Regions:
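Residue-identity detector for glycine
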Residues: 10, 20-22
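Short linear regulatory motifs enriched in tryptophan with gly/pro/ser
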Residues: 24-245
Length: 245
């Protein structure tokens, strides 16, 4: 079992605790996110560069799923978002404060907090489109891989680094990765410092919630990586690219 899968599991656990999802216990061996009967496994693909595979309760709302996506991709919820279903003849879109958006654009806006994930995907292979930050136009394709009897870190997977806020979308991330892989030079130093500042802010935001501080520390403490107390620490998913001094 990879340490990256464990840290990704921890991020979803943080969301469960942070949003009052009934988090039960946190252990690499025996692990629950919520007291629910059905879990679904979702693969989230960002333009063929970054992907995350997570397990969430099927009765979570799309608003909660938005929170999970933000956590596992490393975004900070600075911008607007929407969900849609490919090929939907009604062109429905789910977002926050949907009533204020009706009449703008094409299709009907619905409230993401009032719609369960299971209402959009029911069988293996069903897809949901997620768009975040209409400036960068970050588009994530979500695919239902199936149901899971009980979530555990082995069900979680991650490919590629976190997607930094306001990085000009997929092209920006590709450029950042290319610079980070150089390992030295002026551009590398600038990117390293920028990433450290970005993820330090994210870590500080998470640790502002006492109810999740212990969970966060214990989950991330299971792996040999930068301490969350280290002001120079970056997201674990970036440790493949950056050396933390």
């Amino acid at each position: 079992m990879s340490w990256r899968a464990v840290t990704l599991t921890g991020r979803v656990a943080i969301l469960a605790a942070r949003y009052g999802g009934g988090f039960v216990r946190c252990s690499i061996v025996d692990y629950d996110i919520m007291r629910t009967m059905k879990y679904i496994k979702l693969r989230m693909d960002f333009e063929g560069i970054v992907s995350r595979t997570v397990v969430v309760p099927s009765d979570w709302s799309l608003a909660f799923l938005h929170g999970v996506i933000q956590a596992v991709f490393g975004w900070l919820d600075y911008h607007e978002y929407e969900f849609s279903v490919p090929g939907d003849p009604q062109k429905r879109r789910w977002t926050e404060q949907s009533a204020s958006l009706d009449g703008f654009g094409v299709g009907k806006f619905l409230e993401s907090s009032e719609t369960q994930i299971s209402a959009l995907v029911g069988k293996k292979g069903d897809k949901i489109d997620y768009t975040y930050d209409f400036g960068d136009c970050n588009e994530v394709e979500i695919t239902l891989l199936g149901t899971v009897a009980k979530p555990s870190p082995k069900e979680f997977a991650t490919e590629g680094p976190d997607v930094v806020e306001d990085s000009a979308g997929v092209g920006g991330i590709a450029g950042i990765v290319a610079i980070a892989k150089q390992g030295k030079g002026k551009e590398y130093k600038q990117v390293s410092e920028w990433l450290r500042r970005a993820f330090k802010k994210h870590i500080d935001d998470v640790l502002d919630y006492p109810s999740v501080r212990d969970i966060y520390t214990r989950v991330f403490g299971l792996v040999k990586t930068a301490s969350t107390a280290n002001p120079k620490a970056v997201s674990p998913c970036w440790l493949d690219y950056l050396v933390v001094h």
